[in-house]
Design a protein with these regions (language model features):
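Fibrous stalk/shaft segments of extracellular and virion attachment machinery
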Residues: 1-35
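Extracellular receptor-binding modules and their adjoining Ser/Thr/Gly/Asp/Asn-rich linkers
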Residues: 35-189
Length: 189
């Protein structure tokens, strides 16, 4: 089998911690590592081709990718639902494009994180660009607000006041369509 030093170039199993060290300009080493429990420490990550940073939020209703999500202020427990109208406390968008997804419950070793959490939590985009469900004409740069249809957004009208808690983000693309579709929005964050 081919190897690079003590590490095989393919196959095999590592146990414990794999460390990468790099000498620093001022002496000493900068250490990066991956542990057997899944913890990783790196200075930079490249190649994440997806568009946003997301967190699992407690689910209060059925949602689908692109839905605008808000805190359910009628509940005494933390849960999140589809935003509607100028609803307070918009938190983000149900995403299926995340580069990073944090939170949720720790799955059993053999379980997939997504499958273990999707029934109980919503993957909500907190920062970055994500495709949002909208209706009506949208121009690049328009602020996106919840519409009167739960989970669906719309472009703010010229001169319309919207509290910061209601703003989803701004459109980074636009079109003249009026049907329901998904457009890319830079979520506030």
């Amino acid at each position: 089998r081919d190897s690079l030093g003590a590490m095989p170039t393919s196959g095999g199993t590592f146990t414990g911690t794999v460390r990468f060290q790099q000498p620093t300009y001022f002496g000493g080493d900068k250490t990066y590592y991956i542990t057997a429990d899944g913890t990783a420490n790196f200075r930079k990550v490249y190649g994440a081709v997806y568009n946003d940073y997301a967190e699992w939020f407690p689910r209060g209703c059925d949602t689908k990718p692109g839905d605008i999500i808000a805190l359910d202020v009628s509940s005494q427990t933390e849960r999140y639902i589809k935003a509607v109208g100028k609803m307070d406390r918009v938190v983000g968008v149900h995403t299926d494009e995340y580069a990073y997804l944090i939170g949720g419950d720790t799955p059993d070793e053999k379980d997939d994180n997504f499958k273990a959490n999707i029934e109980k939590y919503i993957p909500v985009s907190l920062a970055g660009r994500v495709r949002v469900r909208v209706t009506g004409r949208v121009k690049t740069g328009d602020l996106i607000l919840p519409s009167g249809t739960p989970g669906i957004g719309r472009a703010a009208c010229a001169g319309e006041f919207a509290p910061a808690e209601c703003i989803v983000g701004y459109a980074v693309e636009g079109d003249d369509r009026t049907d329901e579709r998904r457009i890319r929005v830079r979520v506030r964050g």
